[in-house]
């Protein structure tokens, strides 16, 4: 845990929640695009020391096997992992993060992430892939990327299986 990284992450998240939909709706809005560039840079600095975690680890098989763009694949599981991390050991940090960037709690922040994905036409599930049990098992296995071990809450294979089944509509 790095306090300076927390401050950077909070600033980046505030910018994203304020400007991402605006930049999406109006691509010629220079201020919104500039603020999203700033958010991207600051977010990158924020995870330089603590490294990326579960959403990033799960993005690799989704991108490599199913060709879901990397950023969209990271975002696909973000609201799911916000909820898991808020309920686990150290969850008070996630709750505090959510409050500091303007949400009532982590649940409301996760709901806002999901709503943004819907409004922007981003993937919110994997139902269209019609994944079978073997494909879900493969996603679980490949998600065991080293970044998964950076997550503040231990993510088990059972948790990954449950998440992928939920996303697949099973």
Show the residue positions of the predicted features:
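General structural signal for alpha-helix termini and helix-helix connectors
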Residues: 22-26, 42-45, 49, 64, ...
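A general alpha-helix detector
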Residues: 15, 19, 39-42, 57-61, ...
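Alpha-helix N-cap/helix-start motif at coil-to-helix transitions, marked by capping-box chemistry
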Residues: 3-14, 72, 88, 107, ...
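Amphipathic alpha-helical interaction segments
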Residues: 7-11, 15, 35-38, 57-60, ...
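Hydrophobic residues within well-ordered, non-membrane alpha-helices that form the packing/core
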Residues: 20, 47, 82, 117, ...
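C-terminal catalytic subdomain
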Residues: 50-106, 114
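C-terminal charged capping/lid subdomain of soluble metabolic enzymes
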Residues: 95, 100-170
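Carboxylate- and glycine-rich phosphate/diphosphate-binding segment that chelates Mg2+/Mn2+
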Residues: 1-50, 152-158
């Amino acid at each position: 845990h790095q306090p300076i990284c927390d401050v950077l992450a909070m600033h980046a998240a505030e910018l994203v929640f304020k400007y991402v939909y605006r930049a999406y709706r109006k691509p010629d809005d220079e201020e919104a695009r500039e603020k999203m560039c700033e958010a991207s840079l600051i977010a990158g600095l924020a995870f330089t020391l603590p490294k990326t975690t579960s959403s990033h680890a799960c993005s690799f098989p989704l991108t490599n096997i199913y060709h879901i763009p990397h950023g969209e694949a990271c975002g696909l599981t973000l609201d799911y992992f916000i909820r898991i991390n808020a309920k686990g050991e150290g969850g008070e940090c996630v709750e505090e993060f959510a409050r500091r960037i303007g949400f009532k709690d982590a649940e409301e922040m996760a709901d806002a992430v999901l709503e943004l994905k819907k409004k922007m036409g981003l993937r919110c599930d994997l139902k269209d892939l019609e994944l079978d049990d073997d494909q879900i098992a493969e996603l679980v296995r490949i998600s065991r990327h080293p970044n998964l071990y950076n997550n503040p809450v231990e993510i088990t294979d059972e948790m990954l299986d449950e998440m992928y089944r939920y996303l697949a509509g099973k």
